Amino acid sequence: MSLLKILYYPDIRLRILAKPVKEINKKIQKIANDMIDTMYQEEGIGLAATQVNIPLQIIVVNTMEQKKNNLVLINPKIIKKEGDISIEEGCLSIPEYQASIPRSNYIQVQAVNLDGEKIEIEAKSILSICIQHEIDHLKGKLFIDYLSKFKRERIQKKFEKINKKNKKFSIKE
């Protein structure tokens, strides 16, 4: 396994629309496993392939403390939403910033697993939030897009300033 490089806001590659995975093969399995390793290394609970500059519809999630509970969803699609919940979210691509974002408390998701099987899962609370957050990434959407224009502009200026200082980000929005 190898660690993947996470893209940081305001890198425009975070806005790329992910393409569906056509075939589950060893390359896709390696990408998913590398994403899991990267998620743990960065102490996250979810990661979308677009966050590591892979424009494919793959997300990995684990909201539990045991590493055996990894959830890999390929070509995920939310088919049902219910209820409302809003808690502070963070993002590996927007480090050290959290905001309370409105989400659905309960979702049903159709996807394909790493064995190529079609699956349907139900998620609520933190797992629901995490899956919605990662699926947003596949659509080129960031959690800060739900904030007011004023807050988004402040965040962008902050990260552009960090970019200039650390030269961490190379591509701007």
From Swiss-Prot:
InterPro entries: Peptide_deformylase, Peptide_deformylase_sf
Sites where the protein binds Fe cation: 91, 133, 137
Cofactor (UniProt): Fe(2+)
Cofactor, how bound (note): Binds 1 Fe(2+) ion.
Keywords: Hydrolase, Iron, Metal-binding, Protein biosynthesis
Catalytic residues, chain numbering: 134
GO-annotated biological processes: co-translational protein modification; translation
Catalytic activities: N-terminal N-formyl-L-methionyl-[peptide] + H2O = N-terminal L-methionyl-[peptide] + formate
Domain of life, source organism: Bacteria
Keyword set includes Iron: yes
Enzyme class: hydrolase
Pfam families per the UniProt record, alphabetical: Pep_deformylase
SUPFAM superfamilies, alphabetized: Peptide deformylase
Entry's EC annotation: 3.5.1.88
Gene Ontology molecular function, alphabetical: metal ion binding; peptide deformylase activity
Keyword Cell membrane on entry: no
Family: Belongs to the polypeptide deformylase family.
HAMAP family per the UniProt record, alphabetical: Pep_deformylase
Function summary: Removes the formyl group from the N-terminal Met of newly synthesized proteins. Requires at least a dipeptide for an efficient rate of reaction. N-terminal L-methionine is a prerequisite for activity but the enzyme has broad specificity at other positions.
The protein's name in its UniProt record: Peptide deformylase
